[in-house]
């Protein structure tokens, strides 16, 4: 439900009303909406601020943005105002009023809402590079896991978000009864080849999950990965398993990630068509294997 992050109060309330009637107890939402730097111009049609250097091409969503690049500060700055984190505040308020819980993500591997690539673009801006409104390539995206400056910005955002005071409730976000867990990213991956080794994501997840716990030890933390395994190409073939999901190609090792003390649960996804799964065989094996890994 990524659209909750930027939609109107009435739309957000309607979603929670409907979800409550359906008996839903937990909703996952995006806790990030990152854009480039302000152009100083207003869009004549929408009346919204405009930005340049957006990783997803468009930047703000309905005028809402959570982080943007500030040339004067020389770093990304958090927008805690009416068109910023106050949107998240209202979502949390509605969750509390409907007795529901939220899984809140900190970033996204994909370009939607800026994601990891926006951090990379911010770093490029800090180095005086000219950046356009298009997503960065995969090689540069993987710098998100290893560049120390980028990692410090990511940690700064986490610290600000968890300590942010909700405009409507007066509580820090991390003290809200609506928080079920924090998620490091939506679907983090780092394709293994000459620029990304299979321990990069593990090391990043270990460091960042520990950092979250150092601020908020009372809520669960998940990595947010899709649950890929790292059996190797030969072993995946020997077991007649879909290579993309089991070989380790995406730089994710679900078995290893589940050994991190500061990671509380796994988040396997399943895209049957995209991953070449056979219905009834591969999908059931995927579910059973993850259940076994986390048991």
Language model features with spans:
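Active-site-adjacent substrate/metal-binding segments within catalytic domains
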Residues: 1-114, 159-160, 265
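Alpha-helix termination/capping residues and helix-transition junctions
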Residues: 21-23, 97, 173-176, 259-260
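Soluble non-cytosolic domains of exported or imported proteins
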Residues: 6-10, 79-86, 144, 148, ...
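Low-complexity, flexible helical/coil segments
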Residues: 29-30, 74-75, 140-148
